[in-house]
Amino acid sequence: MLRQVTRACPFCEVRSLLGQAPRSLQPQTRLYTQVQREAQRERGSRDSNTPSRPRDRRTPETDAFPPSSDRGSRGRSPRGRDDRRPSRMILSDAVSRPPQSDQRPARRPQEPFGHLNRTRAPPSLERERERRESHFERPKRNDDGKRRTRAEPYHALKMQRSLHEVPYGNRTTIKRKMELYDSFDKMPLLDTVQAAIKDALPALEYRSPTPAQSVAVPALLGLEAKKRTKATSTKKGGPEAFLLAAETGSGKTLAYLLPTLDAIKKAEQQEKEDAEAQAQKDADEAAAKAQDKRTDIFAAEEPEVNKAVDPARPRAIILVPSAELVAQVGAVAKSLSHTVKFRAAPISAKMSATVIRNQLFNEKGVDVVISTPPLLASIAESNPNILARVTHLICDEADSLFDRSFKPSTTEILERATPSLKQLILCSATIPKYLDKYLADRFPDMNRLVTPNLHAIPRRVQLGVVDVNKDPYHGNKNLACADTIWQIGRSTGEYDPAEGKEAVPTKRILVFVNEREDTEKVAQYLMSKGIDALAFHRDTDPSRQAKTLASFTGSDTSTAIKSSPDAPPKPELASKRTLANTKVIVTTDLGSRGIDTVSVRHVILYDVPHTTIDFIHRLGRTGRMGRRGRGIVLLGPGDRADVVKEVREAMYRGEALI
């Protein structure tokens, strides 16, 4: 016979029918009316014991986080939690701060202008405002009865205010360090390294370090070593870790190359002195043995021992995420090697096995190896001793190297090189939260070298917006892109050498898209409109990639871009008009990471980037090394206009996109 069904717990009802209900669950099998009656009694007793207060009163801290009912059901997971973006797509707002320690934090003194950098009122003023509002009983509310709050900035991208985690005193300290080393002559570099700077910067009349170089070079040379605590001083044998976080186009490559080469040459001098002392010692021992041999006629002669020399043992390893960066960093290292006298070996998967073998296992040896993590990790598996003498490991574009695709091979190289490693240097223009957390756990004592303009797009870069939905485009992004390029290159199109007009330099424009398939489509459309455009993506032929980037990186600006024989044929032009002296590359994020496009003045964002990280890297291809630049966003149907608006406002104020 079935008993009365209750609404308290259906699982308990099933257990009761089977006769297996535990004692702890027996109170849950009560009638629903009985449970409801007991809940009303408890609620009444609680209300009688607590004083009455306004229902909608909230503190400033809770006001910034409204209840879940106000947010709506949009963007919630099945478990009831808010859907959050992955940490690899969110910039970290505490890059300059080391991880929290168990020690009591030191009390920070009040700076003379410290109150100007505050983004929230002091707690005393907050309590005073709450007291006044409760006294007059006139809280500011909206029509629906909720308390009215000031809209937080950067709501669309979930950002925060500029330099919220970098106090005024920290920024003053960084600027003071930059003033101390405003010239390379003030840095204690070797004479050969000082002379090599002229070869690396031939186009600059006044060679002065950038903010990233002023902060990083002295620290990497050991001039500003941090005072280690008792906990860290007990650790012995670990490498000294550095994080160089600086904006795009700030000269990070030269910032880590100069101290590394200085350390390599000093180590060579020390080894040379030790070798001379050892040779003198061996000569003395040989003379003593020769004297003993004359007296002892039965002494046996010792055979000559030939010491095996393995040339594939570099002293420094530079890891980069792409083959294009291998060629770029290798070119900078080659320009320094003529004066400093060291051997650099840039290797990538685009090279043949014979070329890689000749680069690494050269009889003359190798000092610096520039490679991608997967290639070097595969070589280290077959030749484990290749990382046995590495003292400096540099991870350029660390946010990409410690992402899901490169992290296994990067960590494998780091583990193999740790026994002999002295310095670990991580460089990046963007520090996502996942990387910041990983470094805090793996290297808690890491020295963080952060410039004041981290995660900010330079103010010398202007951002314009083209609304594709309006006339005359009517939602056609291809037409809007072609028209924008024609407006940029119109001044160069008027150049006619027959009429004796002044020559206009060739304008180079980068067009960024989100999908790899769109590169070919957009490039074909631009070519049909008389624009010299090429597609650049991962599947592009390696020889064609080198020719395409040669003119845009400044390595070969005198020659024009020529299509390789394997390139697809250009379509028939829709009209006889062609845009002269203008070169365009349509690319994905492959062309936005680390490539030094010094000759690019204009960047067009065909698609709105997914994250602020992509915004920083794409717009960072222009306005490099103190030059001016311009970025143009094509805002089409379905794009986030609020995101573009907030990025534009942040760029106008010079704030960080965090």
Curated annotation (Swiss-Prot):
A motif (Q motif) lies at residues 182-214. SMART domains: DEXDc, HELICc. Its EC number is 3.6.4.13. One of its GO terms (biological process) is maturation of LSU-rRNA from tricistronic rRNA transcript (SSU-rRNA, 5.8S rRNA, LSU-rRNA). It comes from the Eukaryota. The keyword Ligase does not apply. Its main location: mitochondrion. CDD domains: DEADc_MRH4. Residues 233-449 form the Helicase ATP-binding domain. This is ATP-dependent RNA helicase MRH4, mitochondrial.
